[in-house]
Amino acid sequence: MQLNPAEISELIKSRIEGLGASSDIRNQGTVVSVTDGIVRVHGLSEVMAGEMLEFPATKDGQPTFGLALNLERDSVGAVILGEYEHISEGDTVKCTGRILEVPVGPELIGRVVNALGQPIDGKGPINAKMTDVIEKVAPGVIARKSVDQPVQTGLKSIDSMVPVGRGQRELIIGDRQTGKTAVAIDAIINQKGQNMTCVYVAIGQKASSIKNVVRSLEAAGAMSYTIVVAASASESAAMQYVSAYSGCTMGEYFRDRGEDALIIYDDLSKQAVAYRQVSLLLRRPPGREAYPGDVFYLHSRLLERAARVNADYVEKFTNGAVKGKTGSLTALPIIETQAGDVSAFVPTNVISITDGQIFLETNLFNAGIRPAINAGISVSRVGGAAQTKLVKGLSGGIRTDLAQYRELAAFAQFASDLDDATRKQLDRGARVTELLKQQQYQPLPISLMAATLYSVNKGFLDDVDVKKVLAFESGLHQFLKTSYAALLKKLEDSKALDKDSEAELAAAIGAFKKSFA
């Protein structure tokens, strides 16, 4: 049988035309080297900075993703998010065309997730309806609103001397074991009933420490409005570096919808160390203390996203669904110093970015003054405008009393005879110092805090023995709760002290003092 060339070509043409092959055009590359979680990939010509790259799946079928950080002439330097032991030279890498995203929304509340938003608390999957990119541009100047609403931490020393406002960035800084995390956890616990969603980001901590924090929050009933993002010390440096941005995106979801959120980064020193590790492995040139040149930008772009946004921004973002509401994201970053050295690279960076700082000192902590806040060098640059009238009116003298007391106490060690005015100041300072002590996980409502501040300001404690001051305070609180509940309710609602309330409060403290022995 002789085949006609024309027939053959027609047959081939018809076959080609009828071919229904599905094609997936994706940029692919090849792994050149894998070291310490850093992968060099050749052949990805259209990759974006910060894009997610898809690597071969693990043995149990879990997808493995990486983050493209270095775009060089011949290769791409990527960091693996998760396990990388199964990746070898010659493996195929695909571009996804997506920037790293994490799930966001109210479905995450009450859960413990990793840096990628995957649940790690054993309570089943999270059915979040939305995801959002972890790297976002902070709201512009026009979109912002000035800080004028308080975040009540429930800690006397903070709410009276270094108040925090909604949308503020207030740094908590101190050596290890000075109670930094305790201050942050107290602030979360005190948000119960304040319409505030909290995000706690644990970076580079021991898994046992994170477990203890979650247990404390559960015991206080705070997990019902809290998301915990955990990147423990056992996780890769990349996951620790990414976790802060993931937590920020989860908090921004609420800010952009006219709600209030509080985020705690515990702590940014470890995030900077993780980023330094990633940068050095990527062969980026080291600078001061071996940190890369953009370590300031690492923290500034994160903390600038904490802001109070105006009603127009919220309305525009929600396409008119939410009107007349401002949103806020308040940040309490934590920095750990080495032997009180606040002039190191990362501490000075973060101090310059934030709107104030709370210094915690080892000496005060060891002396039993907890929270160990140094009133002299702790400041809040914008929180004063947000402080409630009630606390603002009563806390004016506290800071001065403390500062003068610390100064005089140093001189008094050398002086044998002191005049009455100095002795009076020392006595007042000792009582104020004693009164600002507070048990962990026992934040105070604003009304009881006002009663405490009023009693010391008006001299009710001047003849009470210093060792009995805390007993006086707890007894007074119990007395007010049982006999003057209406007054406390009035103070909570009005957040101001009018003449009638002041007279009633003075009478109540006077009545209690007579019975106090």
From Swiss-Prot:
InterPro entries: ATP_synth_asu-like_sf, ATP_synth_asu_C, ATP_synth_asu_C_sf, ATP_synth_F1_a_nt-bd_dom, ATP_synth_F1_asu, ATPase_a/bsu_AS, ATPase_F1/V1/A1_a/bsu_N, ATPase_F1/V1/A1_a/bsu_N_sf. SUPFAM superfamilies: C-terminal domain of alpha and beta subunits of F1 ATP synthase, N-terminal domain of alpha and beta subunits of F1 ATP synthase, P-loop containing nucleoside triphosphate hydrolases. This is ATP synthase subunit alpha. Its EC number is 7.1.2.2. One of its GO terms (molecular function) is ATP binding. It comes from the Bacteria. It is found in: Cell inner membrane. The gene is atpA. It is an enzyme of class 7 (translocase). Keywords: ATP synthesis, ATP-binding, Cell inner membrane, Cell membrane, CF(1), Hydrogen ion transport, Ion transport, Membrane, Nucleotide-binding, Translocase, Transport. Belongs to the ATPase alpha/beta chains family. It catalyses: ATP + H2O + 4 H(+)(in) = ADP + phosphate + 5 H(+)(out). Its main location: membrane. The keyword Coiled coil does not apply. The record marks S378 as: Required for activity. It is a peripheral membrane protein. Signal peptide: none annotated. Produces ATP from ADP in the presence of a proton gradient across the membrane. The alpha chain is a regulatory subunit.
